[in-house]
Amino acid sequence: MNRSGQVFYQNWLAGIITENEDGYFFQYDENYLQQPYAQGISLTMPLQNQVFSSPALFPFFDGLIPEGWLLDIASENWKINLRDRMGLLLTVCGDCIGAVSIKPVIEENHE
């Protein structure tokens, strides 16, 4: 299953995070990289054209997911397994504390 989210920095589309059977991938948006206001979303993910890849969800993105009782409430309300980190990221991080937010990319089924 492929799942993706648009990553916004200060309401500007900064890039796309994707999960597939090979792991997790993040790539900055080409237009974002050309802007004078462009900043890396994390010190561990500096601005670059190359794709970042990881077998597990990047620690920066995992850190955006709530913890403790708030995570329990989110998991129960949206019926998301606590181990489904990408599902949690896409569901609860649309309005995070801080400059970064994640909006799910909805794939249209063209049959």
Feature roles, as predicted:
Residues M1-E111:
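Phosphate/dinucleotide-binding and metal-coordinating scaffold of catalytic cores
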